[in-house]
Amino acid sequence: VPFFYERHGGNFISASINKHVYVSINQINEKKFILRYSKLENVSNINEIQHPIIREVLKYFKITPGVEITSFADIKSGTGLGSSGAFTVALIQALSIYKNSKKLSKRELSKIASYIEIDVLKEPVGLQDPHASSYGSIQYFKISKSGLVKNYDIYNGNTGLKNFVKDLYLINTKKRRDASKE
């Protein structure tokens, strides 16, 4: 989180799992935003959108009414597995392609997602989730005091690590948490 890395810098290792968030964007003939996620929203004004991440990412890309966004995921929110960061990254990539016909780099994705979650929404989250979702694999990240993040892929070509990972198990405890309320 910024209050720590701005004083000390930081490091973290992330390991992504083979679970995904899917986002579909369609242009529609109505001057509305139709949003389908765990809820359904059908609004005319961007400021009426209840889902904060969707609202702010739409504002970031200056998307006007006439769009339908549908999302679903392999894992429910609140599992502690970085689903909001993964959703933010997926939505940013989908809207960049929709608006600009441009696929963003991993660095651009993680930077925009972090900006939306930390600076715009003021969520008490760190840089790890958007970066883990953007880069995938097993990564070592180094954060400077200025917030610059460098990544190093520590999985690629590491046979010992590959053997270790193939024997890991992920167990669903069915416990839920909200990182923004901790």
Task: Please provide the spans of the model-predicted regions.
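ATP-dependent small-molecule kinase catalytic core of the GHMP/sugar-kinase superfamily
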Residues: P2-F12, N29-K32, I97-E182
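Short secondary-structure capping/turn segments at boundaries of alpha-helices and beta-strands
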Residues: H8-I13, H20-S24
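Anion-binding (especially nucleotide phosphate/pyrophosphate-binding) glycine-rich loop
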Residues: N18-I116
